[in-house]
Curated annotation (Swiss-Prot):
Cited InterPro entries: SAUR_fam
Species classification: Eukaryota, Viridiplantae, Streptophyta, Embryophyta, Tracheophyta
Record flagged with keyword Cell inner membrane: no
Family (UniProt): Belongs to the ARG7 family.
GO BP, sorted A to Z: auxin-activated signaling pathway
Top-level taxon: Eukaryota
Protein's name according to its UniProt entry: Auxin-induced protein 10A5
């Protein structure tokens, strides 16, 4: 059984390029999160990760998904409205 190295390298390159292109649009100092049933994508300041109200959302994510987030960002299992309320409160701080 033989392997075609060129084909493997091309496929790996393709997947790496796709993953990199998804990360590029997240500004430095921000993180991508996916929220709600429709998995709407938001970018949040990484400073939110230290806030108790946001850590509660992270705990919910850990309970539901563990540390496996196939979307490439954090998946938050709450309604968009709840997420927007938490982030609006954090914006006021």
């Amino acid at each position: 059984m033989g392997f075609r190295i060129a084909g493997i390298v091309r496929r790996t390159s393709f997947y790496t390029t796709q993953a990199a292109s998804k990360r590029v649009d997240v500004p430095k100092g921000y993180a991508a999160v996916y929220v709600g049933d429709k998995m709407r994508r938001f970018t949040i300041p990484v400073s939110y990760l230290n806030e108790p109200s946001f850590q509660e959302l992270l705990s919910q994510a850990e309970e539901e998904f563990g540390y496996d987030h196939p979307m490439g960002g954090l998946t938050i299992p709450c309604k968009e409205e709840e997420f927007l309320n938490v982030t609006a409160h954090l914006n006021e701080l």
